[in-house]
Amino acid sequence: GKKKANVYVIMGELSNQAAVQRTKDIDDVIATPDCSFIKIIDKQTSNWNRDEAQNLMTNWLSTGKPFDGVIANNDESAIGAIQAMKAGNIDMKAVVVGGVDATQDALAAMQAGDLDVTVFQDAAGQGAGALDAALKLAKGEKVEHKVYVPFQLVTPANIDKFLKKN
């Protein structure tokens, strides 16, 4: 692997708990020994918006700073960054781009070779988890204060499994 990687982070809406948590998770992972070679060059918000992310990435590209990847709090922002990089003639094979949500557009971007990784939030699994908790409560059974449904990593290697889910 690489000895050093410089990345940009595109955050969601700053007042949104999911954006705050996702950004904290990025920071926490980069702080681990396995990822300590990754340096965040800059972190800005796109408010979950594709156009804002495209403008943000265009501004970053105009600085001329070398970078190796973009980590976005959502797929719309990742796609906006991809559009800016393609417009700026960046070789998409030379950068790693990640998002969250496994939207149809994101899966299409992955199939095109532009998006490297996204995360699938299992809505059916979340619904089933909520229903299961409600049924337990109705029966007077104990339920954990928080019920977690694991996210699933989507890569070109397993994308076929997710194309049918969204």
Where are these regions (language model features)?
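Hinge/cleft segment of the Venus flytrap/periplasmic-binding protein
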Residues: N6, I10-A18, D28-V29, D122-N166
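Structured segments of extracytoplasmic/periplasmic soluble domains
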Residues: V29-P33, N59-T63, A84-G88, A109, ...
